[in-house]
Amino acid sequence: MQSRTTPGAMLTAMREKPPLVQCITNYVAMNIAANVLLAAGASPAMVHAAEEADEFAGIASALTVNIGTLSTQWIDGMQAAAKATTAAGKPWVLDPVAHYATAFRRDAVAGLLALKPTIIRGNASEIIALAGGESRGQGVDSRDPVEQAEGSARWLAERQQAIVAVTGAVDFVTDGERAVRITGGSALMPQVTALGCSLTCLVGAFAATAPEDLFGATVAALATFAIAGEEAALGAAGPGSFAWRFLDALHALDAETLDARARISAA
């Protein structure tokens, strides 16, 4: 198999052996997240019921947890799956959507953080608030620039011993010591609902492919998303046509193009 040292190599490896990713995500995101994984070459499974979430985690190669549409029953499933995934030594990704908005969400995320996610992905406002700072987030939308969250991300990564990804106009990834920025994407991406949620699932797919290099896997997922976004924007008239063009661009993206066009710089 090709060495997994570049985003393109990881994309190739994922397509050669498609990982099964358990995606506990919100109602809004399920369809697009599943289609994003299929377009990229992975296999999605939207399994969240508490009665089976832990058992299914034993089958899946990675888990992603998104708290966009919460209920007590869903939290039970999230915790069960996270415990089983951790016990099996597999990676899992936490997407703390608008965790600062209500006490219910804050409590849910505190419980999930205690279960030690291997990767945390959020927007700038979510990461700032997760690190105890004052964010300007409004509902699920970020009002803070990514660069303002970089210090919070480094602190959170060290505290949680996890990879932290802050996504926005320019993405930022850190493990507390190393850090990079990924440039690319399109201004149309925030105009398509749940596209960020689907990115969390893609991070899980790359993490399943390269569990020995979770930092590199996270960077590769974000770079893949960014280049697909750039390609999709070329012929898009607006967010509607961008959405389906994005799936086509992701499906068509090859390793050589990804490695040639990915803009990743040390931070």
UniProtKB/Swiss-Prot annotation:
GO terms for biological process: thiamine biosynthetic process; thiamine diphosphate biosynthetic process. Substrate binds at M46, A194. Keywords: ATP-binding, Kinase, Magnesium, Metal-binding, Nucleotide-binding, Plasmid, Thiamine biosynthesis, Transferase. Its EC number is 2.7.1.50. InterPro entries: Hyethyz_kinase, Ribokinase-like. It comes from the Bacteria. It catalyses: 5-(2-hydroxyethyl)-4-methylthiazole + ATP = 4-methyl-5-(2-phosphooxyethyl)-thiazole + ADP + H(+). Transmembrane segments: none annotated. Its cofactor is Mg(2+). GO terms for molecular function: ATP binding; hydroxyethylthiazole kinase activity; magnesium ion binding. CDD domains: THZ_kinase. ATP binds at R121, T167. Pathway: Cofactor biosynthesis; thiamine diphosphate biosynthesis; 4-methyl-5-(2-phosphoethyl)-thiazole from 5-(2-hydroxyethyl)-4-methylthiazole: step 1/1. Pfam families: HK. Catalyzes the phosphorylation of the hydroxyl group of 4-methyl-5-beta-hydroxyethylthiazole (THZ). Belongs to the Thz kinase family. NCBIfam families: PRK09355.1, thiM. This is Hydroxyethylthiazole kinase. It comes from Rhizobium leguminosarum bv. trifolii (strain WSM2304). The gene is thiM.
